[in-house]
């Protein structure tokens, strides 16, 4: 990794920004470490993690490992990778990204077919399974929701036949984390908000603004709704003057990118709406983004046209079997370059994409019977390269220049 602090800003300016969302409520340290490592090596510009000191520390350690693997990258023909920015997320009120599902398994009917277990995208719901704590210590068989795995997608809430599952929401406590912005070399923060919460946003901003001088980027994430643009304009007044860059994250359909291709339409539609408002700052999609997002953005002229890409042919492969033309949105005509989307953030899709790798890693680690501790991903170079190739198929959609050299 090359420690070039301005590289992510260059990506924003050139409409090639790629952000990995680990999850504002996701705290499974081993997975966060490996996600950070793989997507940093794949060329991500930003890694977005929970405002949790343990999560921040494990992400930082993964970035250091990525830096140590620069020769490994070069020897396999991968392009050199710049160090991504590390971002932490806060919320100014109740928000689906900042919640955990809960239920008392002792109330579950014995004959329940457990649809909650089947619908959970991260296998956070278990029944009579042994699992490890965040520290790695063994625990007894457990039934319920593994708190560190749950990231608040809410898919289990409506499917429980007995209505036993509920969401436990929480609001950020920036007083504990804000001082770490400088200490832990955090590059960016993101504030999740919703229309009508100007007072809540202002209170949170008062707790954070003293540390903003140490940041390279402030991101504000907001879903669509009546009065969105005027609300964002009010937020801009609250944070002005801002000593760092500003990014609007348009949260189309939160935590849904792994469900299907069509979820990307809400993100694109909202991004187009914010672009048309001509607010100051960069615009980045999130919420329903997946491998169909970039091809659709190019088709709609919301990203610069490809000129000399397709060297690997992977983009064409990645777009099958769905025809992106079946995802209907009106195309723009003759837009100025400043009205292009600046980047895309991927959360659930990027995580699910690598889930088979984590399963293989667990099996390989279990085979190391003579070791007291499980070996990290980088100790299995073949598996690391397999994960990297998967991640790069997604990253190179928006960074077509990052093709792999023949070795």
Label the model's feature ranges.
Residues 11-58, 174-177, 181-186, 196-198, ...:
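Conserved N-terminal beta1-alpha1 strand-loop-helix module at the mouth
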Residues 1-22, 72-83, 407:
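N-terminal amphipathic alpha-helix/helix-capping segment at the start of soluble metabolic enzymes
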Residues 33, 44-45, 51, 158, ...:
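Conserved mixed alpha/beta catalytic, RNA-binding, or beta-rich assembly cores of soluble enzyme
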Residues 56-88, 206-217, 269-278:
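Alpha-helix-loop-beta-strand connector modules within alpha/beta enzyme cores
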Residues 113-138, 143-145, 155-171:
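Iron-sulfur cluster-binding cysteine motifs and their immediate structural context
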Residues 303-306, 337-407:
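C-terminal functional modules
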Residues 16-31, 92-110, 164-172:
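Active-site mouth loops of central-metabolism enzymes
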Residues 319-325:
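Intrinsic-disorder-associated, low-complexity terminal segments enriched in Asp/Asn/His/Tyr and depleted
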């Amino acid at each position: 990794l090359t420690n070039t602090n301005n590289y992510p800003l260059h990506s924003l300016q050139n409409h090639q920004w790629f952000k990995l969302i680990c999850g504002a409520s996701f705290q499974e340290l081993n997975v966060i470490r490996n996600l950070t490592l793989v997507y940093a090596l794949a060329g991500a510009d930003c890694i977005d993690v929970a405002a949790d000191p343990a999560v921040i520390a494990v992400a930082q350690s993964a970035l250091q490992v990525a830096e140590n693997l620069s020769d490994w990258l070069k020897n396999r023909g991968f392009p050199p990778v710049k160090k991504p920015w590390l971002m932490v997320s806060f919320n100014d009120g109740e928000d689906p990204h900042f919640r955990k599902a809960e239920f008392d398994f002792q109330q579950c009917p014995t004959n329940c077919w457990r649809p909650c277990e089947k619908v959970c995208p991260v296998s956070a719901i278990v029944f009579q399974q042994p699992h490890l704590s965040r520290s790695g210590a063994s625990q007894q068989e457990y039934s319920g929701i593994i708190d560190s795995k749950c990231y608040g997608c809410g898919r289990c809430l409506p499917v429980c036949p007995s209505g036993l599952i509920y969401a436990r929401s929480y609001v950020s406590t920036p007083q504990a984390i804000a001082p770490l912005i400088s200490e832990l070399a955090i590059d960016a923060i993101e504030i999740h908000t919703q229309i009508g919460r100007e007072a809540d946003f202002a209170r949170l901003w008062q707790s954070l603004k003293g540390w903003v001088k140490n940041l390279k980027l402030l991101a504000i994430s907001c879903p669509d709704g009546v009065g969105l643009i005027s609300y964002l304009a009010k937020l801009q007044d609250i944070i002005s003057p801002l000593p760092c860059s500003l990014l609007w994250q348009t949260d189309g359909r939160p935590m849904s990118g792994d469900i299907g291709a069509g979820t990307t339409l809400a993100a694109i539609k909202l991004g187009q709406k914010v672009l048309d408002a001509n607010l100051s700052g960069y615009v980045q999609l999130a919420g329903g983004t997946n491998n169909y997002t970039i091809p659709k953005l190019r088709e709609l002229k919301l990203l610069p046209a490809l000129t000399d890409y397709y060297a690997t042919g992977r983009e064409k492969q990645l777009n099958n079997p769905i025809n992106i033309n079946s995802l209907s949105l009106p195309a723009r005509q003759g837009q100025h370059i400043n009205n292009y989307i600046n980047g895309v953030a991927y959360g659930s899709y990027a995580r699910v994409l690598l889930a088979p790798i984590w399963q293989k890693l667990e099996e390989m680690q279990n085979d190391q019977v003579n070791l007291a501790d499980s070996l990290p991903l980088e100790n299995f170079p073949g598996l690391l390269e397999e994960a990297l190739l998967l991640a790069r198929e997604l990253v190179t959609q928006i960074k077509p220049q990052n093709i792999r050299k023949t070795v």
